[in-house]
Amino acid sequence: MNPYVLTILLSSLGLGTVLTFASSHWLLAWMGLEINTLAIIPIMAQQHHPRAIEATTKYFLTQATAAAMILFASTTNAWLVGEWEIHQLSHPLATTTVMLALALKLGLAPVHFWLPEVLQGLELTTGLILSTWQKLAPFALMIQVAPTINSSLLVTIGLLSTLVGGWGGLNQTQLRKILAYLPIAHLGWMVLILQFAPSLTLLSLSLYIVMTSSAFLTLKTNNSLTINTLATSWTKSPTLAALTALVLLSLGGLPPLSGFMPKWLILQELTKQGLPLSATLAAMTALLSLYFYLRLCYALTLTIYPNTLTATAPWRLNFTMITLPLSITTIMALGLLPLTPAVTAMLAL
């Protein structure tokens, strides 16, 4: 793609997200979401491959449907209540419709079916943008409208997403489809705690972005698209294979890695709020996700591809454009757990 065109599209991505962040009026927020969607479509379709075009079409249709639902809900609220402010969403029909529309935009269960199919047709770098940056604007709106939404609906969507995010990845062999179930499960944890501790939701979102970026970048450096090709990683780059396994375990929420922090704090907060059953169900669904992360780790580190070469394995990475962000995100994805006391004091949990 022409660098000037790419610069304009990436600037539009940033503009759309910032516009939604800064909006207090539904129409401006909707415009920001639409700028975001229209800016990423050429980036998704730049490969000129039938799978990429199919993924782009599916993404456009789902995002257009969600945007139409948001516009319908905000117009209905303005008609019934007389308010266009995001914080003044009060009618039950409008709140439920907006919640379902935002769930569709984010890929939360039970309206998640488009996400694995879309990510399967994309390159890993574009998939990273879709899994991180494109989640920010809808999630900002969800945080703003969360106080007006029925808590039972939020908890149900959260638990269903954690279950689907773990269950859906069990029978997958394509890494991009497995990575698609990753945001479904993690965003489910965030929605679960959204009404009780918004600051904890923001912490979880930040760590999710760091860990997801690290996972996508390591797999892109490994040039792996299926579980079988992961077995060749150890002979190509042992250091990167070990780091990838640790990042995946962090995503699964195992101590002493960074991914354990948000799960631990969320379970603690749910118990404080008198929801031990929800906390237990969320912890049990996390085991499903952990199982397929362990499958990937097994393929990465315990399965060595038949190799008759006598050449020594390269332990040092070649310096490329993604080496620095890969290093930073990997360090943060692995070593932030000791900061938990400072984080809890800062968030006053």
Curated annotation (Swiss-Prot):
PANTHER family for the chain: NADH-UBIQUINONE OXIDOREDUCTASE CHAIN 2 (PTHR46552:SF1)
Its membrane topology is listed as: Multi-pass membrane protein
Q: What is this protein called?
A: NADH-ubiquinone oxidoreductase chain 2
Q: List the catalytic activities from the record.
A: a ubiquinone + NADH + 5 H(+)(in) = a ubiquinol + NAD(+) + 4 H(+)(out)
Q: Which organism is it from?
A: Oncorhynchus mykiss
Transmembrane feature ranges: 3-23, 66-86, 98-118, 139-159, 178-198, 199-219, 240-260, 274-294, 319-339
Biological role stated in the UniProt entry: Core subunit of the mitochondrial membrane respiratory chain NADH dehydrogenase (Complex I) that is believed to belong to the minimal assembly required for catalysis. Complex I functions in the transfer of electrons from NADH to the respiratory chain. The immediate electron acceptor for the enzyme is believed to be ubiquinone.
**GO molecular function (one):** NADH dehydrogenase (ubiquinone) activity
- InterPro entries under this entry? Complex_I_Subunit_2, NADH_DH_su2_C, NADH_UbQ_OxRdtase_chain2, ND/Mrp_TM
Similarity remark = Belongs to the complex I subunit 2 family.
Q: Which gene encodes it?
A: MT-ND2
Q: Which Pfam families match?
A: NADH_dehy_S2_C, Proton_antipo_M
